[in-house]
Amino acid sequence: MRRAISHAKNGEWPISKAVDGVTLDYEARHRRRYRLRTHEGEDVLLDLAEAVAMADGDGLRLEDNSWLTVKAGQEDLIEITTDNPQHLARVAWHLGNRHLLAAINANRILIRPDHVIESMVVGLDARIRHVTEAFQPEHGAYHEHRDTPLSSAS
């Protein structure tokens, strides 16, 4: 089984050397070691030194210096919308207070399905809709930045 041994962000790897791709949901895009199935049906071992938060368009370098393209897979999600940005910010605060993964933009918030949270959001007079899309939530204030590795204190 071939091994994927390093990761590069979208735009920082030679896409012309892509020989195949993998479609991964959010959980599978944040792994260190994992068995992947490529679009062509090949099993590849993801074997990175550390877990990396991969995003759509990133690349995985194989041992032979060829590359796999990472595609964010479609997931069942809840789309939250409101009538104005202030109301959406208020809903975002409540979601953040519960430490939920959320993809936030100017017009909507995407979260994973959770009937308790859905009830809370409706109780805040926001609208919900079930959608199927790629999920790329915010990292949060204390995440490992993709461009600066964390040093470990021993």
Give residue spans per PLM region.
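Intrinsically disordered, low-complexity, positively charged segments
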Residues: M1-A51
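Short glycine-/aliphatic-rich beta-strand segments at the starts of folded cytosolic domains
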Residues: L68-T82
